[in-house]
Design a protein with these regions (language model features):
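Claisen-condensing/thiolase-fold acyl-transfer catalytic domains that form or cleave C-C bonds
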Residues: 1-55
Length: 55
């Protein structure tokens, strides 16, 4: 994340996915790029990822 990550993002408990996706979408618009990848640790050895494509 070129604009900071982890604690630097600042978000309420349970809002991690929403804030990461929102920031990724804003970054797609700002830079004019086509793809963004959002990954997140869920704890307990789990993780999730989402690939976004701007159309």
């Amino acid at each position: 994340n070129p604009n900071g990550g982890a604690i630097a993002l600042g978000h309420p408990l349970g809002g991690t996915g929403a804030i990461l996706l929102t920031k990724a979408l804003h970054e797609l618009e700002r830079t004019g790029t086509e793809h963004a990848l959002v990954t997140m640790c869920c704890g307990g050895g789990l993780g999730t990822g989402t690939l976004l494509r701007r159309v």
